[in-house]
Amino acid sequence: MAETTFALVGAWVLVVLGLAIAAFGVVLPVLPGVPVALLATVLAGWLTGFERIDVATIVWVAVLTALAQGFDVLGNVIGARRFGAGRAGLWGGAVGAIVGLILLPPWGFLIGAFAGATGFEALAGRPLPEAWRAGVGALLGTLAGVGGKLVVVVVIAVVVMGRLAGA
């Protein structure tokens, strides 16, 4: 199917809006993040008859999206572990991030990761300086996960916009 100018313009609008929402969603997790970039990619492919955005590109973006979804949790766990957290701190950081996001959107996931790891470590009997250190690790790891997701959104943007431009 030959693409029309209207379809191509629509694809560009969808991709730009989708990528903007994705970037904001990574930083403000009350919005869906990277999955919006995938949705925009699929819709742009459909609008262009899968000529510019082909199935291989969509699969590639889907794989990146799946990987990026694990960055928050993985970053939290790796950060907490590197800063000395035990099992309690790892669970506390993960639970705290989720509860924080629900109770204090949009930044509660950061506060929750820190407070959860610190609190659970303290409850497990760790001295306060060690518990605090685990909380800092969970916070820094969560921030690293956000950074990783932003990198994924930028990579998706470059690839998808390049394909739409005909590169």
Regions found by a protein language model. Name each.
Residues 1-10:
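Short, strongly hydrophobic alpha-helical membrane anchors
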Residues 2, 155-167:
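Juxtamembrane boundary at the C-terminal end of a transmembrane helix
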Residues 17-22, 41, 92-100, 137:
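Hydrophobic, membrane-inserted alpha-helices
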Residues 18, 22, 44-45, 64-72, ...:
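Alpha-helical transmembrane segments of multi-pass membrane proteins
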Residues 19-36, 97-106:
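Transmembrane alpha-helix interface/packing and boundary motifs in multi-pass membrane proteins
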Residues 37-53, 95-101, 115-124:
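Interfacial segments of multi-pass membrane proteins
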Residues 56-100:
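Helix-adjacent hinge/juxtasegments
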Residues 102-104, 136-151:
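Individual transmembrane alpha-helices with interfacial aromatic-anchor signatures
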